[in-house]
Amino acid sequence: MKIFLQSSLPPGPNRRRGPQTRGHPRHKSASFRRSASSGSDTRDSRGRSRSPSSSRSRSRSRSRSPSGSHSRPRAPHVPDQETGRPPGGGGRRGSRDQQQGPGGPAPPSPGEVGTRSGPPETKAKGRLAELISAAYDPPVLLLQGCANTLKSFRRRTTQSYPHTFLCMSTSWTWASKTCTVKSGHRMLVAFVNSEQRTLFLATVKIPKGVTCLKGSFDGL
C-alpha cells in the first residue's frame, strides 16, 4: 500500500533546486576576451595614427639636414704665398689705383711726353684727363711761307739735320672755299717728343718770311 505525501509549503528561496548549469564563468570569459580584443584594436589604431607623425618628423629632420651644411662657416681668404695678393684680383685694383692716382690717370714722365704715335685707346673724361692724354701726343711744327722757300728748306734740313725731326710733309694749301686763310703754303714737321722739337728749333735756322707754330696730333 503506497501513500503519497504532498507538502503544503511553497518552495522558498533557501530551498535547494535541481541541478543547474553554471553560466556565469562563461559570460565572464567572453566579456574578458572582448575587452582584450578591443584593447588590442585601440593599440593598433594608436600605433597607426602615430606612424605618420613619426614619418613626418623623420622627413623634417632629413629636410633640415642640408640646411645645416649651408650654415657652416666659410674658410677665410688666404693670400697667395708667392705674390702676397688675396684671391679675387685685389692686388691688381690696388696697382691700377696707384698708377692712375687720386684724380685720374697719372701724368707722363718727361721721357714719355709726345711718345704716342697712334690715336688714344679710350676717350679721356674730364679736362685734366684730356690734358694728360694730350701730353702723349706727338708734337709737330706748322711752317707757313712761300712754296719755293719751304721746298728748299725741306731739302737742306733733310740732308744736314735728319736726326732733329721724325718726318716732313710736302708743301700744301687749304683747298676749302670757306677758308679765309689761303695766302701762302704750309708744311708740317713731326717729332718723336718735345725734346726733339726743342733741339730742332735750337739747331735748324728758320728762313726769313716763314712763321712757325707749335702743335700736336693724336697720331701720325
From Swiss-Prot:
Region listing for Disordered, in residue ranges: 1-123
Feature: compositional bias, Basic residues: 14-31
Organism superkingdom: Viruses
Location(s) in or outside the cell: Host nucleus
Phosphoprotein keyword on record: no
Listed transmembrane segments: none
Matching Pfam families: PPV_E2_C
Cellular component annotations (GO), alphabetically ordered: host cell nucleus
Gene Ontology biological process terms from the UniProt entry: regulation of DNA replication
Gene Ontology molecular-function annotations: DNA binding; DNA-binding transcription factor activity
Keywords, comma-separated and alphabetical: Host nucleus
Protein family per UniProt: Belongs to the papillomaviridae E8^E2C protein family.
Function as written in the Swiss-Prot or TrEMBL entry: Plays a role in limiting the replication of viral DNA in keratinocytes. Recruits the host NCoR/SMRT complex to viral replication foci to mediate repression of both viral replication and transcription.
Full protein name: Protein E8^E2C
Organism name: Bovine papillomavirus type 3
Origin organism lineage: Viruses, Monodnaviria, Shotokuvirae, Cossaviricota, Papovaviricetes
